[in-house]
């Protein structure tokens, strides 16, 4: 599913670069997709909360993602590429909350932290294998082979989702309403103002937005920087950037699961926010083939920890409200502001100032995340500890 959801993902930049695109327009089409996905995450989360057909949401959006990716083979015109990215992002906005909802519905709140940690470890393993195969196929047969691999993964993901028995999913538990909850009248979902009045949730969303403003563009730009300087094969080097990060993410996601259980989510997220400024510093200083190892290892630490801590913390903060998946979508929307702006900002900065300065600037954006997380520690630490240590 990891490979289906992203389409050709990080290979898009070098695919378009090989066809004469510059970094500015590449960043712009990525941002167009990010904005579309950002606009759809809250409606998608609300729909996931209400629907009893969560499996089919994953199936239909997965098919749309694969078809949208194939548009790029047909044409590399600006409007076609932008449309493909918009469609992929909209589909991806629904897949994330749907998988989280299915997980919560199967294992309930008590088992969510552990199961989500395992899910994310397997998710990163899938990305690792997919990147390795994509790199080899792109090197051996050309970049178009990557599109067909994404389609094959789509078939496998759909088969896996449909193998989950529908009766195994408790759709009330999937939205954060279990029998023992007394927080809401008549066991009904609380209003949307619950999200706006939840201060830890708002701080989390703002910190993630700052983080992704710096993080979103760094992977594709680093790949384009090294490949553009003739220091790496386009397909194989891009695959290496993904594989290094995903290998570290597997370990980081499992570590996050245990650390959250023992110490709460605040420390897990603090470490993840601290990784990005150091990553930007290293990326700006060393645009070399070997630089992929430290730069992408830090990406793996940050993203791997967040992949477990963010959905787990949101599920805890909104437990009993009936708005868990709306909350997931709302936080994804706010962080999506940063993630969607990052490629455009990074792309044009690279075109005007060069790659070195761009990486330093992107890494600097994450300092705002650290400031928020440490500055509001008194509010966040008790909230982040609640529920994380449940067996």
Language model regions located:
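Helix-loop boundary and gating motifs at the non-cytosolic
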Residues: 1-34, 202-203, 207, 212-226
């Amino acid at each position: 599913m990891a490979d289906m959801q992203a389409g050709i993902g990080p290979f898009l930049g070098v695919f378009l670069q090989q066809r004469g695109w510059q970094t500015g327009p590449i960043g712009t089409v990525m941002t167009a997709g990010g904005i579309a996905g950002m606009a759809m995450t809250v409606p998608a989360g609300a729909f996931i909360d209400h629907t009893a057909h969560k499996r089919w949401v994953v199936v239909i959006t997965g098919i749309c993602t694969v078809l949208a990716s194939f548009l790029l083979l047909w044409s590399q015109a600006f409007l076609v590429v932008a449309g493909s990215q918009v469609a992929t992002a909209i589909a991806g906005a629904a897949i994330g909350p749907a998988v989280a909802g299915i997980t919560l519905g199967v294992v309930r709140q008590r088992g969510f932290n552990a199961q989500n940690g395992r899910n994310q470890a397997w998710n990163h393993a899938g990305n690792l294998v997919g990147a390795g195969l994509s790199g080899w196929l792109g090197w051996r047969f050309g970049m178009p082979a990557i599109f067909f691999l994404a389609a094959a993964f789509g078939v496998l993901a759909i088969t896996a989702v449909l193998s989950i028995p529908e009766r195994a999913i408790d759709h009330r538990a999937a939205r954060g309403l279990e029998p023992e909850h007394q927080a809401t009248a008549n066991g009904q979902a609380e209003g949307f103002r619950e999200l706006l009045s939840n201060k830890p949730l708002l701080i989390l969303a703002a910190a993630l937005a700052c983080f992704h403003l710096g993080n979103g563009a760094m992977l594709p730009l680093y790949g384009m920087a090294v490949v553009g300087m003739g220091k790496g094969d386009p397909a194989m080097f891009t695959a290496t950037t993904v594989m290094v990060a995903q290998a570290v993410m597997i370990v980081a996601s499992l570590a996050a699961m245990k650390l959250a259980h023992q110490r709460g989510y605040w420390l897990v997220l603090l470490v993840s926010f601290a990784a990005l400024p150091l990553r930007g510093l290293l990326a700006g200083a060393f645009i070399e083939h070997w630089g992929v190892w430290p730069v992408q290892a830090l990406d793996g630490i940050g993203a791997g920890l967040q992949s477990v801590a963010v959905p787990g913390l949101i599920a805890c903060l909104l437990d009993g409200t009936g708005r868990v998946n709306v909350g997931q979508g709302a936080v994804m929307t706010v962080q999506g502001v940063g993630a969607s702006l990052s490629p455009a900002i990074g792309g044009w900065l690279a075109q005007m100032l060069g790659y070195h300065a761009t990486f330093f600037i992107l890494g600097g954006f994450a300092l705002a995340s650290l400031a928020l997380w440490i500055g509001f520690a008194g509010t966040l630490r008790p909230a982040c500890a609640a529920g994380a240590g449940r067996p």
